[in-house]
Regions:
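Glycine-rich FAD pyrophosphate-binding loop
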Residues: 23-43
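Dinucleotide-binding Rossmann-like beta1-alpha1 core, especially the glycine-rich loop
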Residues: 47-123, 132, 248-249
């Protein structure tokens, strides 16, 4: 079978890349080792935050503004609700992250409300010290991640895309055409888009032609859910990011299973996916979050459940978006990338079709930034 494009990794970004490729009329194959949506990658666990006022830097904001539009368009086209626009509450002190959030609001005229510590307690029952403040970003919130991936794949298939659930064992190149060999089949493709998350090193290792080195690591991440009679989506509680020491908690209002909370910078650095042990394998799977979070959310009750996933990391925590070969495009290190999924999926397909990359993408996300490291 011959295709115009193969998308390797049909998760967050790959599912939307497949959708946009099929929408452009390209003969498309989405390849994933597991039947998506699944629990072996980075996007499961029901929800992912969406925000535009970005503490990680303003270079991301144009991509986020486009993503906001694309999420809405996709919801309308598919007649499905994927985005809860309940707001995103950033909470912290005079940190670089919070100053970046404030700068984003000002420079991009984003809809937001500033709250002091007293107002945070009165309005949301969140207890913080007097030097903390909140920035409530209006019309943002969170996206239903598993449902989004499933919906994008289904939409791609309705447009003629094929899915291949199998493990890739070999990728070679002959006369400008890529041949992808899986355990049970073989296809030929003109172009490849790799968006394989924490599996990217496995994919690149079976490429039998020269490619630049891509520095993507893997971190095992956990999230916890807590029972509560408060902090509910139905009560108007927003998604949140809360500064804690040199780290951040992030979380989601209770809409089914309790208040979901994660912690940004903790988690074991691992080398292979086999090292991602199940939730509860380490004592800190509950302690890293549960030991501290109730200081800020006094109405939380008992821990109810936990989950584990893997995050792909670049050395500087920024995305890697670049051509690895003339017709092989790579997007990786997307540890905070789910909110960008439709934008990055569309960007990757367009880059392959035009053989061009926007100058701002080259400036901030090119693989070349690591050449001197």
């Amino acid at each position: 079978m011959t295709y115009d494009i193969a998308v390797i990794g049909s998760g967050s970004v790959g599912s939307f890349a497949g959708y946009y490729a099929a929408k452009m009329g390209l003969k498309t194959c989405l390849i994933d080792k597991f039947q998506a949506p699944h629990t072996q990658g980075s996007y499961h666990g029901d929800t992912r935050i969406f925000r535009i006022a970005y503490g990680e830097g303003e270079k991301y904001i144009p991509l986020l503004q486009e993503a906001y539009t694309l999420w809405g368009e996709f919801e309308k086209e598919q007649n499905i609700k994927l985005f809860e626009r309940c707001g995103l509450l950033n909470i912290g002190s005079n940190s670089t992250f919070m100053q970046n959030v404030l700068s984003s609001v000002k420079n991009y005229d984003l809809k937001a409300k500033i709250l002091n510590a007293k107002e945070l307690q009165e309005n949301y029952n969140i207890c913080v010290s007097d030097d903390f403040f909140g920035v409530l970003e209006i019309d943002t919130g969170f996206v239903y991640s598993d449902l989004s991936v499933k919906s994008a794949i289904n939409a791609a298939c309705k447009l003629g895309a094929h899915t291949l659930c199998d493990e890739i064992v070999r990728i070679c190149k002959e006369n400008g055409v890529y041949k992808i060999q899986t355990q049970n089949s073989s296809i030929q493709v003109k172009q490849i888009l790799i968006s394989a998350g924490s599996y990217v090193n496995e994919v690149l290792s079976v490429c039998e032609f020269d490619l630049p080195k891509v520095p993507v690591g893997i971190r095992r991440k956990v999230v916890n859910w807590f029972d509560t009679d408060s902090y509910k989506l139905s009560q108007g509680f927003p998604a949140f990011i809360l500064e804690f020491e040199d780290d951040y908690f992030y979380g989601f209002p209770d809409f089914a299973d309790g208040l979901k909370v994660g912690r940004d910078k903790v988690g074991e650095i691992i080398s292979t996916r086999e090292e991602r042990v199940e939730f509860g394998s380490y004592e800190q799977d509950t302690l890293d979050i549960g030991k501290h979070i109730k200081e800020f959310f006094p109405d939380l009750k008992d821990f109810s459940k936990g989950s584990v996933c893997t995050y792909p990391l670049s050395p500087d925590d920024d995305f890697i978006i670049d051509f690895l070969d003339e017709n092989l495009f790579f997007m990786g290190g997307l540890s905070h990338g789910f909110k960008f999924a439709p934008t990055l999926g569309l960007l990757g397909v367009k880059a392959l079709q035009t053989q061009k990359l926007d100058p701002s993408i080259k400036q901030y996300f090119s693989l070349k930034r690591f050449e001197a490291v």
